[in-house]
Regions:
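Loop/turn elements at helix/coil->beta-strand transitions in domains of secreted/extracellular proteins
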Residues: 27-32, 63-68, 132-137, 169-174, ...
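Polar, surface-exposed loop/tail segments
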Residues: 54, 84, 142, 147-151, ...
Length: 582
């Protein structure tokens, strides 16, 4: 009897311990990135400017952490997104020019062709690493990575992509939603934007229905006509300058509405407290002397992170953070060790760096039809710029930017001798080789103190850091773009990923690829009706009667190859073409 009682006690203890073990097991967190475009932090209530009503961003700020020293690596989108997707500086692998794909007409007229930058062999898109670790990954919808995405990077990348499409609600997700309504083009294109405002998409996914609804619409100013705005000193201090500010604030409010729609969906699904929400902008503001430039108006970007259960709610974090830190931080947040090739450091999560970064770095190279090369280093107070083409003007004409009325007004004022001292600085015909700015006392970076003896030590420190950084990453800015293209496209065309090596035995399909850095994926044709993504190949795949297995091999920056297997026979291998092939 005693033995029986002891046995029952032992069983009970085992059950209790087992239950405790299960309860201690943490459920994987979801990650949601909400990405605005072309937006500086200076114009947001969370950062001190209440002119634009942003209730959803304000909520994130109240319930989360506001990061006050966050910086892009570039003042424009494509190089920034190259970094956000890889954890590499764009100028470390030839992705620094704006842009490599989808050239503007003026760039084509200047002889710039479409091409893909080619990252090193070992580099994966960070979303692919998330997929390999069990995450369902979606991107809605902007890509623009300076190379075509890995076909294994996303379960879905389209205007329809959503965590709600995952096949099992228990699968953790990493989802991105881009809000392009704040984009520079929104300063002159005032049509309502379906994708950015977050309206319900037609059930049949018909873009035509959306177009019919929105193509002739116009968004009026959402701020009062008499709103008292503060126009930056480098812009026209007249009605045109004020109207530009009002349009920018209006677009911020529209973006906030889209953010609110996604947050509501997250709450409807009961996922708010199971998700880390990261909201940021891809670079600085849309106005002249903001976007593309390496002043804080172009590099400094807002960042708000809401952690589950409002952890650290209301906190303001003044550590320096950079876009190159985002991929390692994303992985660190979900307990994945960042790969060694990443050039940034995690600022949160299990693999958070012990020492915060001391400097952030930035670059500016070709923008559309205009070529330059500038590098930037900044600590918490001082900004250093190195101009490698000092003989070139500060202002470089860009046909795209000149669609803006406020840009046209600046040029008119220049031509009529009406610019004041601050406005005229941007139109100087040559540059100083070195520039140094005290961003605390000179937030618009108008007063170059590089030659002031009082700041000689600061200048020397930042100059040394700039040189060290460029050497460390093997900066490709010194290579002419035409020579970069020859390196990436040695025969005048994109390099090809090797065809899949397929072996079929006993109903199993084994695949390999000889291209270094290539990835292998597969999918069954029967599954494409409800899922178009590719599964990672990790070992032999079973054939299914009457079904076709499609196989893909892809190395970033190369064209991918596709073949198929049906009834024990391999089909032809082909390389899909697109209008950007050369």
């Amino acid at each position: 009897m005693k033995i029986k009682n002891k046995l029952l006690v032992l069983i009970a203890i085992t059950i209790i311990l087992g239950c405790e073990f299960k309860s201690d097991k943490k459920e994987p967190l979801n990650i949601l990135w909400l990405v605005a475009e072309d937006l500086s932090p200076f114009y947001l209530n969370a950062y001190g400017d209440p002119r634009a009503a942003t209730p959803n961003l304000d909520r994130l700020a109240r319930e989360g952490v506001v990061y006050t020293n966050n910086f892009s690596v570039s003042g424009v989108c494509s190089p920034s997104r190259a970094t956000l997707s890889t954890g590499l500086y764009p100028n470390s692998f030839g992705a620094q020019n704006m842009r490599t794909l989808f050239q503007q007409p003026a760039a084509r007229e200047a002889g710039i062709i479409d091409y893909q930058a080619v990252p090193p062999d070992e580099v994966k898109m960070v979303s692919e690493i998330m997929r390999e670790n069990g995450y369902y990954t979606t991107n809605n919808a902007k890509e623009d990575y300076q190379f075509f995405k890995s076909e294994l990077a996303w379960d879905e990348s389209s205007v329809f992509a959503h965590w709600r499409n995952r096949p099992d609600v228990n699968i953790p997700f990493f989802s991105i939603f881009n809000f392009g309504v704040c984009h520079e083009s929104g300063m002159w294109n005032t049509k309502a934007n379906f994708f950015d405002t977050g309206d319900e998409f037609p059930p049949d996914r018909s873009i035509k229905k959306w177009w019919e609804k929105y193509s002739n619409s116009h968004v009026p100013l959402l701020v009062p006509e008499d709103l008292d705005v503060q126009v930056p000193p480098y812009l026209p201090q007249n009605e045109i300058g004020k109207n530009a500010m009002k349009r920018m604030y209006t677009n911020v409010m529209r973006m906030d509405k889209g953010v609110g729609r996604i947050l509501n969906q997250l709450e409807e699904d009961g996922l708010l407290e199971k998700t880390i929400i990261v909201w940021y902008s891809d670079h600085g503001g849309p106005l002249p002397r903001q976007k593309r430039l390496l002043y804080d108006s172009g590099l400094r970007v807002p960042l708000i992170i809401r952690y589950p259960n409002k952890d650290r709610a209301g906190e303001r974090d003044d550590r320096l953070t950079s876009f190159v830190d985002f991929p390692p931080t994303l992985l660190s947040m979900v307990g994945i060790e960042p790969p060694n090739y990443m050039q940034g450091q995690a600022f949160e999560g299990s693999f958070k760096a012990e020492v915060p970064r001391k400097f952030i770095h930035g670059h500016a190279d070709r923008f559309d039809e205009s070529v330059d090369m500038i590098r930037a280093v900044r600590n918490k107070r001082f900004k250093y710029l190195k101009n490698f083409n000092p003989e070139r003007p500060y202002y470089l004409p860009l046909a795209y930017r000149e669609n803006m009325e406020v840009m046209q007004e600046l040029l008119r004022m220049r031509d009529h001798g009406e610019l004041d001292e601050n406005q005229a600085l941007w139109f100087r015909q040559s540059k100083e080789i070195e520039e140094l700015f005290d961003t605390e006392n000179d937030p618009h970076e108008l007063n170059n103190i590089a030659k002031d003896p009082a700041y000689a030590d600061v200048l020397a420190e930042l100059r040394e850091e700039c040189e060290s950084w460029m050497n460390q990453i093997d900066d490709k800015g010194f290579i002419r773009e035409v020579d970069l293209i020859k390196k990436f496209y040695p025969n005048g065309k994109a390099q090809l990923t090797d065809k899949p090596n397929v072996e079929i035995s006993d109903g199993k399909v084994s695949v390999s690829c000889e291209t270094p850095g290539s990835r292998i994926g597969y999918r069954y044709t029967s599954e494409k009706a409800h899922y178009l993504g590719w599964k990672h190949y990790t070992g032999p795949v079973l054939e299914r009667a009457g079904d076709t297995i499609e196989i893909i091999t892809h190395r970033l920056g190369f064209k991918y190859a596709i073949t198929s297997v049906f009834n024990g026979e391999q089909g032809k291998t082909f390389y899909p073409s697109n209008r950007h092939d050369n």
